[in-house]
C-alpha cells in the first residue's frame, strides 16, 4: 500500500535546527596525545566506561561499509575485542555488511562518546574460526541460538517465523552445547588511520589524526586537523 506523506507535518522537523550543546568537559592538546593510537583509544574508552552513563554502550560503534556499486551503508555494532592487530566485531557472514566487506574490504568505525568521538579507518579480514569459536562459547545460550536463527534471515520475515525457528533450534540443540554456525564469525578491522575529536566551547573543537610511518603500523605521527 502506498501513502503520500509529502505534506504531513513532522513533530520535530524545525526543532532540530535549534538543538545544540556547549561542550565544556575538556580539551585535547598535542602534549596530551599518547604515542600509540591504540593506547589513546584504550584510555578514552576507559574514561567513557568510568562515566557510567545510564543506557550508554561504550563499545558500540557505527560501522560504515560500501558496496561494489559504491553505495554506502552504516549500522551500529558492538566491539568485542581489540589489540594492536585491530578491532573485532562478530556478525552473520550472509548479512549485507559481510557481503559488502567481502566485495570491498575496507571500513570505517565511529565511536560517539560523551563530548568525544573516535573515527578509525582500515582494511578488513575475517577472524580465524578458532578465535570465533572461543568468543561464541562465551556468549549466553540465548544469543548462541539467536545466531542460528539468523541463518534464515531474508529481506522480509514475520515475527511468527522467527519464533518458530527459535523453538526449532532450541529443540535441535537441547541438552548439548550450541556449536558455532558455519555462516557466523568475526571481522577484524586493521587500522591505517585514527582521528580523535574533543568537543570544545564555541565549536573550535580539538581534532587530531594519527597515520602510520611504516607498513607494520609500529610507529605513528599525529597532526592537528580543522575542527
Swiss-Prot record:
GO MF, one example: pyridoxamine phosphate oxidase activity
Catalytically driven reaction(s): pyridoxamine 5'-phosphate + O2 + H2O = pyridoxal 5'-phosphate + H2O2 + NH4(+); pyridoxine 5'-phosphate + O2 = pyridoxal 5'-phosphate + H2O2
One Pfam family in the UniProt entry: PNPOx_N
Pathway: Cofactor metabolism; pyridoxal 5'-phosphate salvage; pyridoxal 5'-phosphate from pyridoxamine 5'-phosphate: step 1/1; Cofactor metabolism; pyridoxal 5'-phosphate salvage; pyridoxal 5'-phosphate from pyridoxine 5'-phosphate: step 1/1
UniProt-listed Enzyme Commission number(s): 1.4.3.5
Residues that bind pyridoxal 5'-phosphate: 20-23, 80, 135, 139, 143, 203-205
Keyword check for Disulfide bond: no
Cofactor(s) named in the record: FMN
Gene3D superfamilies from the UniProt entry: Electron Transport, Fmn-binding Protein, Chain A (2.30.110.10)
Manner of cofactor binding, per the entry note: Binds 1 FMN per subunit.
Residues reported in the UniProt entry to bind FMN: 75-78, 90-91, 96-97, 117, 152-153, 197, 207
Recorded superkingdom: Eukaryota
Signal peptide feature range: none
The UniProt record lists the keyword Metal-binding: no
GO biological processes: pyridoxine biosynthetic process
Function as written in the Swiss-Prot or TrEMBL entry: Catalyzes the oxidation of either pyridoxine 5'-phosphate (PNP) or pyridoxamine 5'-phosphate (PMP) into pyridoxal 5'-phosphate (PLP).
Family label: Belongs to the pyridoxamine 5'-phosphate oxidase family.
The protein's assembly and partners: Homodimer.
UniProt protein name: Pyridoxine-5'-phosphate oxidase
Species assigned in the record: Dictyostelium discoideum (Social amoeba)
Amino acid at each position: 500500500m502506498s501513502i503520500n506523506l509529502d505534506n504531513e507535518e513532522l513533530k520535530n522537523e524545525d526543532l532540530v535546527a535549534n538543538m545544540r550543546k556547549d561542550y565544556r568537559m575538556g580539551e585535547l592538546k598535542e602534549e596530551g596525545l599518547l604515542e600509540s593510537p591504540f593506547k589513546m583509544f584504550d584510555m578514552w574508552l576507559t574514561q567513557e566506561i568510568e562515566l557510567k552513563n545510564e543506557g550508554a554502550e561504550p563499545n558500540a560503534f557505527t560501522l560504515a561499509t560500501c558496496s561494489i556499486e559504491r553505495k554506502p551503508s552504516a549500522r551500529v555494532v558492538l566491539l568485542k575485542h581489540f589489540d594492536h592487530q585491530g578491532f573485532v566485531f562478530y556478525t552473520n557472514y550472509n548479512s549485507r555488511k559481510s557481503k559488502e566487506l567481502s566485495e570491498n574490504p575496507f571500513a570505517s568505525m565511529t565511536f560517539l562518546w560523551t563530548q568525544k568521538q573516535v573515527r578509525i579507518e582500515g582494511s578488513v579480514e575475517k577472524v580465524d574460526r578458532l578465535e570465533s569459536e572461543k568468543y561464541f562459547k562465551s556468549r549466553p545460550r540465548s544469543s548462541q541460538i539467536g545466531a542460528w536463527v539468523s541463518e534464515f534471515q531474508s529481506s522480509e520475515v514475520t515475527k511468527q517465523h522467527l519464533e518458530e525457528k527459535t523453538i526449532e533450534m532450541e529443540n535441535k540443540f537441547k541438552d548439548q552445547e550450541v556449536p558455532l554456525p558455519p555462516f557466523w564469525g568475526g571481522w577484524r578491522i586493521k587500522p591505517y588511520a585514527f582521528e580523535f575529536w574533543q568537543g570544545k566551547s564555541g565549536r573550535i573543537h580539538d581534532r587530531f589524526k594519527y597515520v602510520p610511518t611504516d607498513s607494520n603500523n609500529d610507529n605513528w605521527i599525529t597532526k592537528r586537523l580543522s575542527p
